[in-house]
From Swiss-Prot:
GO BP terms, alphabetized: sporulation resulting in formation of a cellular spore
Keyword Disulfide bond carried by entry: no
tRNA processing recorded as keyword: no
One Pfam family matching this protein: GerPC
InterPro entries in alphabetical order: Spore_germination_GerPC (IPR019673)
Keywords of the record: Germination, Sporulation
Gene: gerPC
Upregulation: Expression is sigma K-dependent and negatively regulated by GerE.
Superkingdom of this protein's organism: Bacteria
Identification of the protein by name: Probable spore germination protein GerPC
Function: Required for the formation of functionally normal spores. Could be involved in the establishment of normal spore coat structure and/or permeability, which allows the access of germinants to their receptor.
Amino acid sequence: MNQDIYTYLHQLQQALQTQQAAILNLEDQVRQLQEELNELKNRPSSSVGKVEYKFDQLKVENLNGTLNIGLNPFSAKGQQIEDLQVDTETLKVNPETETNPDFYQGILQEMHRYLDEEAYNRILHFEQEERTPLDEMYRQMMVDDIKKQMEHRLPYYLSQAQSYEGISTDPDYLRDIIIQAMKQDIDKAFLSFIQHIPGNFRKE
């Protein structure tokens, strides 16, 4: 009987010691958490706030003083296609070309093809060139923003196309010049966007 009592008391003592050790361990953890909490409370507060991305916030000033992001049209001085040596006289286009839906549709199809198949690599190229990596979300936003402007900008490009010998009677030549100008301006818009994007929008 005495042996049984001794064994029971010994086991009880071991259980109490185990519980006491567990309690001490928990107290240490609580103390550590309390210290960390106090440290966080004593740190200077910094509020980032809600970050919203809007292309309008990233507009840059163009040559004539207006704000523009996305697709930069010809400037008033026609400097967007310098390699084509375009002067400032407005082209008198053939009315049939100006109102022909197939003419407009052909240009729009080519520009959408460019945006779908080539624009992404152009953006990556400019990111590497400027050492400014972007998240995928912003790349897609750039392309989508340009797409939304295509149809509305096309008449402006047509009106700003400049006089070349034979261009007013050659719709294919006019089409090629407009497409070249639009592609060049799209690339300039991508580059300008990347150069002016705030640091907190850049990919870490």
